[in-house]
């Protein structure tokens, strides 16, 4: 049987493909969202370092953050962003495929209670 990684390699699955699939899916559900660009151009940083690739609002007002990955792992700043979202009742989904987003949305809506940072 072929693995997910082997299938992605065969069809040339990239992180941009995942972002496009996820955004199309969120559109189909009527979820307000946008692509969140971050980076550096010359000497100027833009965006919030570590923030998710796609940010949105679910119908109940819950903040949605989707980090898309293909071959790489989350950076330290991305893990910190995830913790901040989850600690404040947001829904964070780490997505290697569209199925990860579908599963996250189905299981989501049950974010953790906020933790006090002392």
Predicted ranges, named:
Residues 1-118:
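Catalytic phosphate/metal-binding cores of nucleic-acid and nucleotide-processing enzymes, i.e., regions
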């Amino acid at each position: 049987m072929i693995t997910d990684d082997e299938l992605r390699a065969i069809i040339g699955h990239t992180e941009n493909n995942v972002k496009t699939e996820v955004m199309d899916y969120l559109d189909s559900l009527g979820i307000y969202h946008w692509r969140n660009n971050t980076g550096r151009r010359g000497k100027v940083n833009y965006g919030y370092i570590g923030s998710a690739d796609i940010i949105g609002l679910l119908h109940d007002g819950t903040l949605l953050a989707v980090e898309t990955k293909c071959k790489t792992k989350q950076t330290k700043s991305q893990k910190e962003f995830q913790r901040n979202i989850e600690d404040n009742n947001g829904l964070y989904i780490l997505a290697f495929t569209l199925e990860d987003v579908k599963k996250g949305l189905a299981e989501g809506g049950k974010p953790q209670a906020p933790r006090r940072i002392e």
